[in-house]
Amino acid sequence: MVSRVLVANRGEIARRVFATCRRLGLGTVAVYTEPDAAAPHVAEADARVRLAKTNDYLNAEAIIAAARAAGADAIHPGYGFLSENADFAAAVADAGLTWVGPPVDAVRAMGSKIESKKLMASAGVPVLDELGPDSVTQAQLPVLVKASAGGGGRGMRVVRELSALAGEVAAAQREAQSAFGDPTVFCERYLPTGHHVEVQVLADNHGTVWAVGERECSIQRRHQKIIEEAPSPLVERIPGMRAKLFDAARLAASAIGYAGAGTVEFLADDSPGREGEFFFLEMNTRLQVEHPVTEETTGLDLVELQLAVADGERLDVEPPAAQGHSIEARLYAEDPAHGWQPQAGLVHAFDVPGSRAEFAALGQRTGIRLDSGIVDGSVVSIHYDPMLAKVISYAPTRRLAALVLADALARTRLHGLRTNRELLVNVLRHQAFLDGATDTAFFDTHGLAQLSAPLSDEGVVRLSAIAAALADAAHNRARAAVFGSLPSGWRNLTSGYQVKTFTDDQNNKHRIEYRFTRTGLVLAADEAVQLVSSAPDEVVLADANGVACRFAVARYGDDVYVDSARGPVHLNVVPRFPEPGSSVAKGSLVAPMPGNVIRLGAQVGDSVTTGQPLIWLEAMKMEHTITAPADGVLRSLNVTTGQQVEVGAVLAIVEDPESQAKGDS
């Protein structure tokens, strides 16, 4: 019997496994690297072992040594990292430890997407034909380049022009090597408006194979899921599709002697004349990021069942029937409006008001579950995936589940990093999503710019700026030693106004001019706003109709976050007397995020053209290309391969030939 479990992972999945282990009375062991030293999963474990290097979550020997040192008798791989590495699974078993996962042969069979598709085809599971990167023709475009190992959108590229194929294959190979330790890639036909539908399977070592339920994960960015749900709206509307999917999934699991939790992923088509067709993509021989939606609709604890199967227990003949609807939103530290740029830094505050459960099912009661890898004060590193948390809803109907989740995200208190929160809320409230029209081209169809729009309109931003100014005044008043009883900004000369200026995330400037008189607040602008009350962290304002709204205000240096029922607002304080500083030279290439320079595409003195790739950055295991802003000459190059850079650093300068000629004359 398992008694102490080491989780060979980090973040929210480590916390998720620990939660079940604690409920079952099992000991827990965390491994961590230096960037994760203060992470929540480390603090919550009964024992913790430090790994020497930032990439040691991929070091099988180090993890097994940690298990032995901490007295663990089982290893749970989580997902990502080594979770689908057959050699790691074999090494765990050879070390005399229990592997909380499928048999080694099953992991190996599914570890290569190339070989697994051949195996599934021979077993009678429908598959898309594989294409060799060297044999793709113009007629076969568009194609999808995919890493043979791993997942999560890494090592994946869509290619629409044959001339771009070689470069995209090379980039996918580098990403795959960095993320999974295996650079092998292949190509397959790309369906631009397909549906990503998957089946959760669970099998024991006694011949029972469950198809627990399906999920749809078609809302994706960079081929990585961001909204997942159960059941699938596509499957719900096509008669007979669920039974065929379940049969194919059970067939896939049985063909490789599977045991434990796994997911069989399919690409489904609903174009005219092909409705309900589906093709095997891959089998993930591990727990999925999106497993909570299956737990919510079935009432199962999939981690508990993984542990039970690892202990040799039998499953019931049939799984429980699914009920209701569950949707999961992945909260990422990234900026969708600017190329999905990952963000890194300090999380000042994080709270999802009204969440009723953490890392556990809601008991099929309408509400919100939170599976988070962060808490107040967490630091998001450039070294790992930018997912901060998963916010999950459950409700009797899909529409209610979507609206409950959107409301919870909109009310979430999240200070310190730019995230995809606005995108998630706008998608969940979009009529097309509510109607179930959710294919993989959702962002292209409905416009990423519109879907990334702020949740708060201009009027709310203006009110939030007023609230921020008055909260600052209350803060100053509280600090005043002599005139602490007087309103901040009160003057014997009543004509004087206090001024506070902010910029919002759209670079709009908000100048707030106010003064306090013996009769109350006066604003210089013609704004029908009344002050009900003010404190350093809370201001209540009323509009012309007397409707009051509470604004919670938090300031961290020059960053101000204002949360209200009308929407979240982030502001920056504009100093009254800006410090003199050097401006960035024209043609400068500025790092849009912190990261590591992994490749350079030109040398100083080279002529470059608009859009030409010049510098490749790696951040959070994804490549990001910095291109030339205009035709010109690379005048300076301030970085070298392997160098780590901070956001805002000037990497290089491209100068147009005329400017260079003037400078030389």
Annotated model-derived regions:
Residues 548, 554-592:
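Catalytic P-loop NTP-binding/switch module of NTPases
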Residues 543, 563-564, 604, 612:
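C-terminal amphipathic alpha-helical interaction region
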Residues 156-158, 233-237, 387-396, 411, ...:
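Short, well-ordered beta-strand elements within core beta-sheets of diverse protein domains
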